[in-house]
From Swiss-Prot:
Name of the protein: ATP phosphoribosyltransferase
Cofactor field: Mg(2+)
EC number: 2.4.2.17
The keyword Glycosyltransferase is assigned to this record: yes
Recorded GO CC terms: cytoplasm
Primary role: Catalyzes the condensation of ATP and 5-phosphoribose 1-diphosphate to form N'-(5'-phosphoribosyl)-ATP (PR-ATP). Has a crucial role in the pathway because the rate of histidine biosynthesis seems to be controlled primarily by regulation of HisG enzymatic activity.
Organism (species): Phocaeicola vulgatus (strain ATCC 8482 / DSM 1447 / JCM 5826 / CCUG 4940 / NBRC 14291 / NCTC 11154) (Bacteroides vulgatus)
Localization, UniProt: Cytoplasm
Pathway this chain belongs to: Amino-acid biosynthesis; L-histidine biosynthesis; L-histidine from 5-phospho-alpha-D-ribose 1-diphosphate: step 1/9
Matches recorded under InterPro entries: ATP-PRT_HisG_long, ATP_PRibTrfase_cat, ATP_PRibTrfase_HisG, HisG_C, N-reg_PII-like_a/b, N-reg_PII/ATP_PRibTrfase_C
Main location: cytoplasm
Matching CDD domains: PBP2_HisGL2
Superkingdom, natural source: Bacteria
Amino acid sequence: MLRIAVQSKGRLFEETMALLQEADIKISTSKRILLVQSSNFPIEVLFLRDDDIPQSVAGGVADLGIVGENEFVERKEDAEVIKRLGFSKCRLSLAIPKDVDYPGLSWFEGRKIATSYPGILKDFMDRNGIHSDIHVITGSVEIAPGISLADAIFDIVSSGSTLVSNSLKEVEVVMKSEALLIGNKNMSEEKKEILNELLFRIEAVKAAEDKKYVLMNAPTERLKEIIEVLPGMKSPTVMPLAQEGWSSVHTVLDEKRFWEIIGKLKALGAEGILVLPIEKMIL
């Protein structure tokens, strides 16, 4: 049985639960219980505060954890990064009052900066030879300049709307963060086998993200040109149709290039284009 530590609420919690659900790992979250066992996979989920997850994994309380990179780097716990998960993306940035002219990092020399991430901020300032007064607070960091508690803030930024609503502007991006799957360095071989099965499922789900399964009818005489346009996984599937001179072509397209490629296919005579979502993809 593997124990995985997960944030107990918030965006990271929601996206983690969605990932486990897509991997067909059933976890009941209907009751506010700290430890919940999956009904169909040898895993149990321990719900914790995000800043407690790195320590719980490093100390062996949990075998795995899904945590924001920002918290993992800040805590400096001795755990292994197993996989970058690509969701709950944000950045840690320095922000100052919007009406202040910003000449560069030298502006922060001797200034008071409010933050919940003093370790990351100090490392950044030390690398750049800046001496600032780091003021540690938890929660509502963005109000600090407005109540004269600090000259600037160092905090998580997602959309930037919180900064705008507090009359602040982002001036330096210090690090970019996303969800990480971290693991204890001393897992047993039995637990590693379960981890490998978990990773197999996660990778199948992640591989299918932003991908579409596309079927189309294509004139056989243009097949070579059509296949050259398609950036399929290996080679598209081509099957002759009952109507002479036509073939059915099946492939997988990246959603980011979908409309660009579909336009080229139509110009080459493709018809009856059917687009389907992909839940999982085994590579």
